Amino acid sequence: MAAAAAAAAVGDPQPPQPEAPAQGLALDKAATAAHLKAALSRPDNRAGAEELQALLERVLNAERPLAGAAGGEEAAGGGGGGPGEAEEDALEWCKCLLAGGGGYEEFCAAVRAYDPAALCGLVWTANFVAYRCRTCGISPCMSLCAECFHQGDHTGHDFNMFRSQAGGACDCGDSNVMRESGFCRRHQIKSSSNIPCVPKDLLMMSEFVLPRFIFCLIQYLREGYNEPAADAPSEKDLNKVLQLLEPQISFLEDLTKMGGAMRSVLTQVLTNQQNYKDLTAGLGENACAKKSHEKYLIALKSSGLTYPEDKLVYGVQEPAAGTSTLAAQGFAGATGTLGQIDSSDEEDQDGSQGLGKRKRVKLSSGTKDQSIMDVLKHKSFLEELLFWTIKYEFPQKMVTFLLNMLPDQEYKVAFTKTFVQHYAFIMKTLKKSHESDTMSNRIVHISVQLFSNEELARQVTEECQLLDIMVTVLLYMMESCLIKSELQDEENSLHVVVNCGEALLKNNTYWPLVSDFINILSHQSVAQRFLEDHGLLVTWMNFVSFFQGMNLNKRELNEHVEFESQTYYAAFAAELEACAQPMWGLLSHCKVRETQEYTRNVVRYCLEALQDWFDAINFVDEPAPNQVTFHLPLHRYYAMFLSKAVKCQELDLDSLLPDQEMLMKLMIHPLQIQASLAEIHSNMWVRNGLQIKGQAMTYVQSHFCNSMIDPDIYLLQVCASRLDPDYFISSVFERFKVVDLLTMASQHHNMVLDVEHERSMLEGALTFLVILLSLRLHLGMSDDDILRAEMVAQLCMNDRTHSSLLDLIPENPNPKSGIIPGSYSFESVLSAVADFRAPIFEPGGSMQQGMYTPKAEVWDQEFDPVMVILRTVYRRDVQSAMDRYTAFLKQSGKFPGNPWPPYKKRTSLHPSYKGLMRLLHCKTLHIVLFTLLYKILMDHQNLSEHVLCMVLYLIELGLENSADDDSEEEVSMGGPERCHDSWFPGSNLVSNMRHFINYVRVRVPETAPELKRDPLASTSSDALDSLQNSGTAQVFSLVAERRKKFQEIINRSNSEANQVVRPKIPSKWSAPGSSPQLTTAILEIKESILSLLIKLHHKLSGKQNSYYPPWLDDIEVLIQPEIPKYNHGDGITAVERILLKAAVQSRMNKRIIEEICRKVTPPVPPKKITAAEKKTLDKEERRQKARERQQKLLAEFASRQKSFMETAMDVDSPENDIPMEITTAEPQVSEAVYDCVICGQSGPSSEDRPTGLVVLLQASSVLGQCRDNAEPKKLPIAEEEQIYPWDTCAAVHDVRLSLLQRYFKDSSCLLAVSIGWEGGVYVQTCGHTLHIDCHKSYMESLRNDQVLQGFSVDKGEFTCPLCRQFANSVLPCYPGSNVENNLWQRPCNKSTQDLIKEVEELQGRPGAFPSETNLSKEMESVMKDIKNTTQKKYRDYSKTPGSPDNEFLFMYSVARTNLELELIHRGGSLCSGGPSTAGKRSCLNQLFHVLALHMRLYTIDSEYNPWKKLTQLVEDMNSQVGNEDQQPEVPILYHDVTSLLLIQILMMPQPLRKEHFTCIVKVLFTLLYTQALAALSVKGTEEDRSAWKHAGALRKDTCDAEKCYEVLLSFVISELSKGKLYYEEGAQECAMVSPIAWSPESMERYIQDFCLPFLRVSSLLQHHLFGEDLPSCQEEEEFSVLASCLGLLPTFYQTDHPFISASCLDWPVAAFDIITQWCFEITSFTERHAEQGKALLIQESRWKLPHLLQLPENYNTIFQYYHRKTCSVCTKVPKDPAVCLVCGTFVCLKGLCCKQQSYCECVLHSQNCGAGTGIFLLINASVIIIIRGHRFCLWGSVYLDAHGEEDRDLRRGKPLYICEERYRVLEQQWVSHTFDHINKRWGPHYNGL
């Protein structure tokens, strides 16, 4: 048999064998295996080995299994049972052989016993739930499986749960990655010492079999691989091969799970080079093997980085003089050795594009190994297996197998080296892959396990040149998508940048490689090698330069751009991930003095790269106009390393800075970005589309800002501190295009800016200067100060949740940097600056999360508008911060008006940056400040309060940071000889402030008003002399000077400048001929900055001479200038503060201020209105008029809404609602008047034009969820916990009805109970009324309006036109009747007997069939709506479908449902009294009319009318019982009395008279009381009954026997004893239930409790029908108060009487006779069915309030049980598990497995459990979803973290705890049916949930 099997395996053409019994075959295999094992155990085992090889050769022949995959389908479909069977057979053989003839399971167990189990190593794939503990982690990538996490002790640790993105492995037990204290119990013990050695013979067979098995697998992989054709991707073919191989790979995976012993055998097999050589060499004779080997060689071909097909596009340039030779030899991307690609070039088979032949030389002195360039050579199975894993694009099974082996240390090292060896090949495969996302995840899944271990990373860095390989591979990867840069000089640029539109960047294909690079740089030892290696640094800077200037934006000036490119996403992601994150990784290792050398290296090569870049883009001195790139990674590297050098390494800044010319160049592009930001916000780039705004926002956004805008501003601060301040300031205003605006003239012409942009650009320029001079992030602030400033800025904009703060505070963006969010300093700073506001509810139901809000002292002392401006993504946030600041000042009484941004003192500058303050003390800035102050004072156009604010801010900054050479007293008033060249004598602001400027020469258009009033028309020599001496200057003659200076510097230092001849781009571009003629005018000014400030004070305050120097009254202010009153205020305060500071700093200033104040201030010149301004004013006037018209209209509408608003439409809190008055309240008016909210008319409802109430009809099962226990049930959180719904109100009523239907006539049963406990129809209204015809046209307009949110007009849904509450029907108001009319009905003196007759007579009158009117149509229509609201199963309980009795039952049950629900809304009792608050704005009166109208169409045959049985004695009782062949009617004592009440009332003609109502209640109370006595008698024991019978019999003859409970109880017992009711009780029943000790008090309590539900419903009904108020009372007196209210208790009766219930009785006929009659029906029934008879008598009357399930405190408890729970239908774990919070059912959200008739499970369950309302907790998201009919909404979460925040989708994975308050609100919305009104975001679910 073995021979036959073997022969079949070889594939000889054999006749089909008759199938042998499997068992025999197994025995045979076992015998062969045992024989071979014995043979191999001998000392000379050569023969055994050969025999085994021959067997394996046959069994594992590689020819057949993949024939189906590789060679078409025939083989697979062909005979012999297909390849599957043969493979299974081969695997069976392998298992038998490994076990050596024993059982395979036993073998596995034996091997497991030798597992040292030091590491967990459990491998998981994407979406697996794992944990990360930062307290225990050494590497930030550390993760634990759930089991190890819960087995370890992490209490109080900073941990979180996360859903794995790419897969991972458990690190428990690995002390390289985590601290031992965090190991779980299983991996804590280093148990290897206790494990005995593995017996040699146990794994001997494995050592023989596995090499052959793995070789066979490799042959399959070779055989199955076909190079993908150029046109079609081959994924399908690859997947087919992999599917066929799945059993083999699973087999290997199972072997790895056997533990350490088996893993070490596998390691030997996989890494043994001899084995590999022997097996792969001996292939000569086998043709098939040859073919597979050839395929392998073809596949290997493209594995190196050398491209033989590279086309030479540009020759390699010789290295330019002065550039680093290394850079030139290496990949000199920045110096332009890479040409543009010819787009017609086909990609070679490798998918890389030819990019010029480059000299390939050694990358660094350390690179001895050239193997990265060459084709791979494999020396072991492991190497080839990894090769195929890559080739097949990382199949999940293979990845898992390779990772499962990692706990074996020897394997881990070998595998890591192999992975590094294949790194370039991985990159090439990844680039070509069509599934790069999946592949990326799988690569990282592997690499993160290898590179997170520092020791291992260091080892492969040393032994395998890991760093060289990574950098080279990254460089090569990016080279395939380079294009010529168009920045600056488009034609002559030699710079190449990445093309952000390429898939490589767009799809983030590079991220796995960058992620690995960042990971290894997080290890100090590896990073140090990188920073020491000059060659690597050069290469890396070349790599970074590929991103320098990418995604260039060119401003559209004519028409809107046609296609808005979205490439900026790719650009920002690339800079952050590929440039910034590695930079942060390197920076984290440059923290101490000892690492100075590293910083010097980076700075040096960075500057070289920058110099190369400037050369390559051909940059001279001016940036090209209308161009901006946000990407300057080289600048940012340079800036960040400079900052680190000064801050942490005590390096001298000047030693790292280049010459002045380079500094001037360095500042240009970052400054261009700042100017462009202002342009973008001024809408100057509007034609470029929204994406340019997106770029401006991303640049400052929290995840990017500290890698982008912060380094840019820091670099500008460094340049400003070292360059000439006048040059810098003039450059800023030039860049911002506002130079022309800075003139004293009232008119000017700006050649580079439209007038409408001037103001915002000027604001931008000044704001930028303020930020530049105020910001200290890199200039001396400590990390904690920075954190505090960032936090305060964010909190000032808005209150924030903890998680949003964590997200908004810019942190080191390198995830491996070890800076942990939520670390100690974050929490301590947060508690210092903010107060926590617990989660709250706002009226209307919107839920707030836990928020942090700034403390009062933070607003007072730390609010920093500059930081806020820097960090706002949206401009509105700045306004929000100011509004909040204003509110604080008003609340705290510090300032009542509209404050200006406060001036905040800055932390001191680091000495290296002192030069920055020279900007504040340069003449150019002082000229600008002077000019702007003057222009503001003279009301020139385009100047705003914001400009003034910034001007004053800059002056104050200058005074705070006074210049060092402060010998200002000696510099007298400044003689004329000092100021020929400029306006001011010196550069010190303190002295320049008092310098008077008399005349200024300006260039103005000829039309300017200045020319008309030239003060110096006479040309006398005196005048000219004085002009000469007054220091007149044209503003910004300095600009030209600085330009000259810059040009000189450049010419001096740039030896090659003569080679580069290019026209200088004019800085002011303008259309020819567009500029008007300018002429020179001379203005008389005669002001100083001080005088302008004082006049400004007058202008701002609106009073002449308003400024009075405070030191004249109180000299103290000069000594103690920090006066709190100046801290907060408006412009006036700011001016006062500045003048005081100026006076404090200089006696001269103080004197001049006093002098100016003494002079009478001349009035400000009147404002002339120009034509343009007049136009603006007209516009304003028109706007104002339009506004007034709008106000009028709004006021009119508001008056309509007033009544609605007054009732405080707070649907959330029923207890404080005021009812909406539906009708007018004057009792003398006979007819109710209604307002129509659509047409606004008032009037009564009529037959022809009925008015209706806006109502929402909904099916409800809330009543059915009531239980007899007040404690809510708990959500099951273990298998053994189950919820059974036997004790719910719905279940009990269901059982009762089916019991009645089994024994009694169906039509009678349907009148004996109520339905609607499940699926009852609840009607609620907002209280607004409308004409029904108006409503129809309103619906029509909604139908035509396509923009509908969340409701379906076709289903009749709409929102109330006034209050927007959701509704779906209109309930007609019956004409005439007014509730209050019934109040003044005359008291009735008729006897009870007369009233009983009247009731009977009125019920007997047939209801008049309504005439065909609009009203009757509407009544019919609304009845149809009510029926359609609930499902058929909830309204059809009759045995004969469609029976009228059923209709009848449904209608009165609707009334019952609404009354019972109102009771529940009132808390289950009527103790609180009051109007119908909890019933919302009740519509019961109107509902009653509709129901009564329809019920009167049916008549109950007077024979069957229960009223007869209640009020008359029957002559022949036997006729009632019914005979044998027909079922009897339901005995009256089994009837539900409340149902009887509703039947009786609805059968009466409406409106009902109060006396008839009271009569019906009195009659029914007698029946109810008798039922109570009967139920009590059944509850008592035999002894109780005999005692009660005896006691009552004694008093039977007293006068009040009919009102004595003892007598009546005694009589009921004696009557019921005639049947078998009491005989059934066995002794065992008594033993089970502990008997109650009955006392007279407890019996009275029982009777009252039995009757109370009826009294409550009757009282509510009386309240609604007759408008009587409900009395409020204590709980214990509820019975007596309600009885009095209903007229059951005589008014003179003492309510504190202990036995009061019987006193309410008013028997219509002799009590004992009628009781006898009622009891006879029962005894007849119990003759046959005693047990059922007794069950029907005991009715559960006291239902407690309904509750949702009780949830556990900690969400993890729910999550751990349910997220792994399997679906009962498909037994798989659902993707989106959910649990119903009403009944605890586990459901699959959106699960197709549980779909029935196109309804998914949640929708179906919501219909079955809640009649259309479902409340589900989504396990994987922690949120609650509400289903209401055909709509659904996300409600929010009832589980919050320690900071009061939701964690939707468990993204943060922090522990969550129940928020009781939220859960109560959810429950209350469920009970009060207000989901539709409170939750606003509804959408259709299309039955797909």
Curated annotation (Swiss-Prot):
GO terms for cellular component: membrane. The chain crosses the membrane at residues 761-781, 919-939, 1807-1827. Keywords: Coiled coil, Membrane, Metal-binding, Phosphoprotein, Transferase, Transmembrane, Transmembrane helix, Ubl conjugation pathway, Zinc, Zinc-finger. It holds the Pfam family zf-UBR. GO terms for molecular function: ubiquitin protein ligase activity; ubiquitin-protein transferase activity; zinc ion binding. Residues 1167-1199 form a coiled coil. Pathway: Protein modification; protein ubiquitination. Residues 1-27, 338-362 are annotated as: Disordered. It is a multi-pass membrane protein. Its main location: membrane. A zinc finger (UBR-type) spans 118-189. A zinc finger (RING-type) spans 1306-1364. The modification Phosphoserine is found at S343, S344, S1199. Belongs to the E3 ubiquitin-protein ligase UBR1-like family. Interacts with UBE2A and UBE2B. This is E3 ubiquitin-protein ligase UBR3. It comes from Mus musculus (Mouse).
